[in-house]
Amino acid sequence: MDETAREPVLVDLALQGGGSHGAFTWGVLDRLIEEPWLKIEAISGTSAGAMNAALVADGWTQGGAEGARAALEAYWRRVSQAAAFSPLQRSPLDRMMGRWTLDTSPAYIAMDLMARVVSPYDLNPLGLNPLRAVLAESIDFERLARAPIRLFITATSVRTGRGRIFRNKEITADVLLASACLPTMFHAVEIDGEPFWDGGYAGNPTLTPLVRESARVTPFWCKSIRANGWSRRARQARSSIGSTRFPSTRR
């Protein structure tokens, strides 16, 4: 059957947070967008999923499906290039063994311990975040405001613990940074005088607007639902706890 002649299928996408999940989701989205019959109506995203959502919508507005694919690739390559200068690198042994983990990286272990006792306001008093420059280079927020793909980006209010959903015209670099703001690593991001943390604490991702406003579409939920497993090691145990607690999809 000629795929170009196939009847279009409207879909909503729900994209979870987590840096590595976000990179994986890039590959999933790249493959989905290749299909000419698939039409994206709306995307709900949190944290890294919020970045992917904004990239798809902005890229699509500029150049259709190929524009969305190009925007995703350009962003993740910029992130990768920026990470090349980070002190958080795999240990020589991990490189030799072909393991993609930071669990034995001295810099990562030191940062992990430091983050438990020292506030990011002390470690990084200026609140610098290299991701801000990457976002500014990757997304045209004025164009995003008029994108045909509707966006629902979640961030968590520090004061109330409730999620706030931002739509296309409200989305700025601050909104995306707020959606990905881990409180042990970054300053809370203020929006309209209100401090926000990572959206994953309230909805990872939020499904409510997709269900209420897009009744005729097929939902496509891209998130990890498999825990890391049971371990006797402290760091892996904390990771498992986070994997169990953080995917708090709000329906």
Predicted regions and their residues:
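Patatin-like phospholipase
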Residues: 1-44, 54-251
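Gly/Ala-rich beta-loop-alpha elbow adjacent to hydrolase catalytic centers
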Residues: 45, 49
